[in-house]
Amino acid sequence: MAEICKMKYTVLDSPLGKIELSGCERGLHGIRFLSGKTPNTDPTEAPACPEVLGGPEGVPEPLVQCTAWLEAYFHEPAATEGLPLPALHHPVFQQDSFTRQVLWKLLKVVKFGEMVSYQQLAALAGNPKAARAVGGAMRSNPVPILIPCHRVIRSDGAIGNYSGGGQTVKEWLLAHEGIPTGQPASKGLGLIGSWLKPSFESSSPKPSG
C-alpha cells in the first residue's frame, strides 16, 4: 500500500500575486497562483524579492528549496542556475507517461530566455506528431514556472494558452525573461530570446522515489 503524503503548504507574495507551494518530505507537489491579479511590476524593472507570507513550522526541504528558487527567479534570475531543484512528488511524476516525459524534457532542455513550440517539444519528447498531446501535458503541469510551460508557444509566434495563471501572466513571464513573441519558429540555437533548436538533446532528471 502506497504511503500517504503528509502535505505542508507555504505562501509567497510575488509580482504575480500570492503563490502557494505544496509538498511533502519526499518532494514538491504543486505551485499554484492564488490571485488572478494583474502583475504589479514592469518586467523590465528589477522586482522586489518575493516575501514569504507564512507556512507551518518544519517546512519540508523541497518547499524550502522551491521558495529559494522562486525568490531567485523573480529577483536575480541568473542565480537559479546555481540552485538545487526540489524533488518532485506529484502523482504525475510517479508514473511512466508521455506527460511526464514532456515535462521532464521541458525542465531539462528549455532554459531561461529560450522558447520552444509545441511541435518542437513533441519532437524532443520522442513523438514529433504529438503537438496536441504536448498541449495537454502543459495543462497538466502541477509546478508552473519551475517547469516552464510558459516558454512553450505556437510555431507562428503566438503565445497560446497558459493554465498556470492566464495569458497576462504568461506574457509577463516571457517579458521577464526577455523573450520576444510574435516571431515564427526559426533555426535558433537556444540563445537568450531565441527559439530552441529541435535537435538539441539532454538527459532527463529523475523524479523522487
From Swiss-Prot:
The modification Phosphoserine is found at residue 14. One of its GO terms (biological process) is response to ethanol. It is an enzyme of class 2 (transferase). It comes from Rattus norvegicus (Rat). Its cofactor is Zn(2+). Binds 1 zinc ion. GO terms for molecular function: calcium ion binding; DNA binding; methylated-DNA-[protein]-cysteine S-methyltransferase activity; methyltransferase activity. It is found in: Nucleus. NCBIfam families: ogt (TIGR00589). The active site is at residue 149. Zn(2+) binds at residues 5, 24, 29, 89. Involved in the cellular defense against the biological effects of O6-methylguanine (O6-MeG) and O4-methylthymine (O4-MeT) in DNA. Repairs the methylated nucleobase in DNA by stoichiometrically transferring the methyl group to a cysteine residue in the enzyme. This is a suicide reaction: the enzyme is irreversibly inactivated. GO terms for cellular component: nucleoplasm. DNA binds at residues 99, 118-119, 127, 132, 155. This is Methylated-DNA--protein-cysteine methyltransferase. Its EC number is 2.1.1.63. Its main location: nucleus. InterPro entries: MethylDNA_cys_MeTrfase_AS (IPR001497), MethylDNA_cys_MeTrfase_DNA-bd (IPR014048), MethylDNA_cys_MeTrfase_DNAb (IPR036217), MethylG_MeTrfase_N (IPR008332), MGMT_N_sf (IPR036631), WH-like_DNA-bd_sf (IPR036388).
